[in-house]
């Protein structure tokens, strides 16, 4: 059995699918329509990024994975969990961008603004849980595969950076430093996630 996320191209496609799926689940509860727009933007942007990446780099293929990456339940769980967390984080970032663009133009207000705030906050909490659990699974897998839980390589550092940033945003919100802005500073997460 092979994990559906074995290379960069597959990761981008998986993020697009999971981001849209997260948007659909949130839309079932909110029924505001704005989350569908955010999911559409995330899906379209991710697909476009995948097309551009594949056409410019053309380095990813559906080649068989190296032995250490094959048939490892913990690795598959780690990768799927952390990429789901990244997709949810990107969805929260897109919602925050919508808020930051629409609020000053008075396109949204009142209950829609509060609803958008709650949705971005909830999605960011969901993202944090999956990103944190995925990072820990990655450490456990690394310890079993290479004998070290944490090696400070770029992917590990990137995952840690995303977890710490999400924790910072959520704690700042809880402390009242972000008060009426929805977790609007999650938009800074957007540039960091694709590079992990």
Q: Could you tell me what each predicted segment is?
A:
Residues 1-61, 77-104, 116-145, 154-188:
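Hydrophobic cores of alpha-helical transmembrane segments in multi-pass integral membrane proteins
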Residues 63-76:
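Juxtamembrane membrane-water interface segments that cap and precede transmembrane helices
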Residues 109-113:
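Membrane-interface interhelical connector segments
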Residues 187-196:
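Single conserved hydrophobic/aromatic residue that forms the stacking wall/gate
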């Amino acid at each position: 059995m092979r994990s559906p996320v074995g290379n960069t191209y597959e990761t981008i496609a998986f993020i697009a699918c999971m981001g849209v799926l997260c948007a659909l689940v949130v839309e079932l509860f909110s029924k505001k329509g704005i989350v569908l727009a955010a999911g559409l933007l995330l899906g379209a942007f991710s697909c476009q990024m995948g097309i551009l990446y594949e056409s410019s780099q053309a380095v990813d293929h559906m080649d068989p994975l190296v032995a250490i990456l094959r048939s490892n339940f913990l690795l598959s769980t780690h990768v799927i969990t952390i990429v789901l967390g990244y997709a949810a984080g990107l969805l929260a970032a897109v919602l925050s961008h919508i808020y930051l663009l629409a609020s000053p133009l008075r396109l949204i207000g009142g209950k829609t603004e509060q609803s958008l705030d709650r949705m971005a906050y909830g999605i960011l909490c969901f993202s944090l849980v999956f990103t944190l659990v995925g990072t820990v699974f990655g450490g456990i897998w690394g310890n079993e595969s290479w004998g070290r839980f944490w090696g400070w390589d770029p992917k590990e550092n990137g995952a840690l950076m995303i977890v710490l940033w999400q924790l910072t945003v959520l704690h700042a919100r809880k402390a009242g430093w972000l008060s009426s802005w929805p977790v609007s500073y999650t938009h800074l997460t957007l540039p960091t996630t694709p590079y992990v």
